[in-house]
UniProtKB/Swiss-Prot annotation:
Transmembrane segments: none annotated. Belongs to the succinate/malate CoA ligase beta subunit family. It comes from Halorhodospira halophila (strain DSM 244 / SL1) (Ectothiorhodospira halophila (strain DSM 244 / SL1)). PROSITE patterns: ATP_GRASP (PS50975), SUCCINYL_COA_LIG_3 (PS01217). Pathway: Carbohydrate metabolism; tricarboxylic acid cycle; succinate from succinyl-CoA (ligase route): step 1/1. Keywords: ATP-binding, Ligase, Magnesium, Metal-binding, Nucleotide-binding, Tricarboxylic acid cycle. The lineage of its organism: Bacteria, Pseudomonadati, Pseudomonadota, Gammaproteobacteria, Chromatiales. This is Succinate--CoA ligase [ADP-forming] subunit beta. Succinyl-CoA synthetase functions in the citric acid cycle (TCA), coupling the hydrolysis of succinyl-CoA to the synthesis of either ATP or GTP and thus represents the only step of substrate-level phosphorylation in the TCA. The beta subunit provides nucleotide specificity of the enzyme and binds the substrate succinate, while the binding sites for coenzyme A and phosphate are found in the alpha subunit.
Amino acid sequence: MNLHEFQAKHLFTEAGIAIPRGYVARSSAEARAAAERLGGSAWVVKAQVHAGGRGKAGGVRVIQEGDEIERYADSLLGERLVTHQTDGRGQPIHALLVEEGLEIARELYLGALVDRASQRVVFMVSAAGGMDIEEVAASEPERIHTVRVHPAAGLQPYQCRQLGFALGLDKAQVGDLTRMMQGLYRLFLERDLSLVEINPLIVTGEGRLLALDAKVTVDDNAVEIGRQSQIQDMRDLTQEDETEVRAAEHNLNYITLDGNIGCMVNGAGLAMATMDVIKLHGGAPANFLDVGGGTNAERVAEAFKIILSSPSVEGILVNIFGGIVRCDMIAEGIVAAVQDVGVEVPVVVRLEGTNVEQGKQILADSGLDLIPADDLADAAAKIVDIAGQVA
């Protein structure tokens, strides 16, 4: 679960991390009032969307006149911002963050994430702040410095100093960085975060360290079990894929992709393998969809509806392994779902597991135009061929 910048900075404030003064605005009048409240001669106005690259896309601007703030706010609010991290439709803008203008001496990068390989929280810094850190890692990896935090010992002051010295900070700034990193680490643990980024972390003209930007991702599992109820209230569904939100309401794990072959599979591992085999046969999956272990007719019907909501889908591959549930029950669910939904694209079905022969017989006796497959390779070859003919 992602947070808006202003929400992330609210958490930063609770953790004692210094941020610029600023206010959230949801109208042009509120934006101007925020600037007047801040005072000064320059302000930074930022579109609040769940995407990076806002500056290059016109979603961040330094403004020096109140009238211009209103005009700029009017041009953003209610519109959609398209960046290199969004799809072609972009993300809707419902709020702006208006902050004080600051003199910037240096732009740095500070981030923390869960490294699955080492099973540690890893802190990263770079003197290449304000840039896409992935690009820096690819082109100049020597500019990124990291420390791994032992879960029993926690983040140690010497590790913070190590990164501060790597950035060339002076003694006072190293102390600021140490306090900032320790606050971030506490926040990371207390709020069940999986990622936090400050890009850029700036050194002001006065030599202070400030979090000029903020990106926070919360572990979805912690939110779903209710451990982070306060953060759950911060969720902005308008920033999420509508189909994925709908799928989650029915306990379906769905991710939109760019292909034309819809996939319905039980089990995340089998779903990924199914997509791999489709690609191997020259096709392109339109989605990842895990219907889960307790598959029933209602869930299968909803899965079909969600898959078919994409106009790009020209065929569907159903790949089910009957372990927890029997294949005959799954087949009955597929037949009922296809009859209920009125599926008009070709459907290839591969069943394997308990009572598989009974399941295949149910499909054969249904009178529906369901195409059986003997194994996954056969299923992938058939759906790729059929979808290609439809296209």
